[in-house]
């Protein structure tokens, strides 16, 4: 085999490998998530298990479920400030972001801290058999600062303060 032919084939093989890697990366970014995984519809818990006093964490949906004015609300665990995980503080009855000190009420509305808006939400549907389904494929932005639909001060000391 001549040197020229060898180099030509090596260039073709290299170009093919780069094209395949680019196609794989593009497919991986653009593909939809399977049903039951983040980015899709996730069946969670029974409607009756979601109470107005607490926030129930659903790991597969990366979501907290709570009940506001009789309706189940799904709040994304991600802080809208810089994306840290927001935790439910049972003693205070509110959500706290330990990264930069944002506080959110039970409805996910920002109460204090650097967060630019309330916690983002996912669409919720209750099936005929009473299962709460969370559609994590579409994110609804949280309420702007100053929105306070719940008149609930913290119940006690915050978890970050303890």
Predicted regions and their residues:
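Structured, soluble extracytoplasmic/luminal domains of envelope-associated proteins
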Residues: 78-120, 125
């Amino acid at each position: 085999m001549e040197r020229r032919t060898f180099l030509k084939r090596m260039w073709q093989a290299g170009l093919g490998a780069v094209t395949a890697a680019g196609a794989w990366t593009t497919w991986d970014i653009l593909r939809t998530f399977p049903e039951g995984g983040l980015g899709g519809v996730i069946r969670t818990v029974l409607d009756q298990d979601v109470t107005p006093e607490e926030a129930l964490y659903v790991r597969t949906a990366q979501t907290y479920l709570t009940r506001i004015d009789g309706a189940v609300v799904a709040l994304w665990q991600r802080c809208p400030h810089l994306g840290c995980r927001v935790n439910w503080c049972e003693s205070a009855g509110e959500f706290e972001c330990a990264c930069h000190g944002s506080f959110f009420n039970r409805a996910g509305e920002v109460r204090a801290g650097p967060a630019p808006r309330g916690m983002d939400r996912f669409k919720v549907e209750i099936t005929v058999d009473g299962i709460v389904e969370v559609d994590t494929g579409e994110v609804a932005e949280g309420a702007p600062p100053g929105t306070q639909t719940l008149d609930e001060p913290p119940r006690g000391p915050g978890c970050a303060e303890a």
